[in-house]
């Protein structure tokens, strides 16, 4: 949670209110850990970044034109420690999602990001993700999300 506490003020300073006091919370990360879907990047003994690499697809993903019954690997809760931003941590975590997809026998990778998150909107296309559409999520009212997909 220390990483979230460092990242959230930076997100808010850029107008990105995707994360806040209520999300993500310790219970969310505890569930990720229990399901063996939380990935941690470590540099010099410090947590450099985290992501949840899952098969969880929100029902609203269908609004982006996706068949949510297809097996896909989905990245959620991607965060990079400010001390390690610009060092390829997010790229490495996204590449880990590709490894998980290959092991799971799927070639579909998906991710969504807040419409105000300019950093990830720049990152995902550089990694081969294609913009698929804009959605809203019932669990995050008042926010808009951009969906991206990559086929291996």
Segments (PLM) and residue ranges:
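A short helix-loop-beta-strand connector motif used in the catalytic cores of GNAT acetyltransferases and
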Residues: 28-40, 56-57, 74
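Conserved GNAT acetyl-CoA-binding A-motif
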Residues: 94, 101-113
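Conserved acetyl-CoA-binding loop-helix of GNAT-fold acetyltransferases
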Residues: 80, 86-99, 122-126
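Conserved GNAT-fold acetyl-CoA-binding loop/helix
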Residues: 8-31
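Conserved catalytic-core motifs of GNAT/GCN5-like acyltransferases
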Residues: 112-113, 125-145
């Amino acid at each position: 949670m220390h990483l979230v506490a460092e990242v959230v003020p930076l997100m808010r300073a850029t107008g990105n209110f995707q994360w806040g006091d209520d999300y993500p919370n310790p219970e969310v990360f505890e569930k990720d850990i229990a399901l063996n879907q939380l990935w941690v990047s470590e540099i010099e003994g410090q947590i450099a970044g985290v992501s949840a690499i899952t098969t969880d697809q929100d029902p609203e993903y269908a609004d982006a034109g996706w068949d949510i019954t297809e097996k896909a690997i989905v990245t959620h809760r991607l965060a990079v420690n400010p001390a390690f931003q610009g060092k390829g941590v997010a790229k490495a975590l996204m590449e880990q999602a590709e490894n998980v997809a290959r092991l799971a026998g799927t070639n579909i990778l998906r991710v969504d990001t807040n419409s105000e998150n300019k950093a990830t909107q720049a990152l995902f296309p550089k990694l081969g993700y294609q913009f698929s559409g804009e959605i809203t999520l019932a669990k995050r009212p008042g926010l808009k999300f951009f969906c991206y997909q990559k086929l291996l």
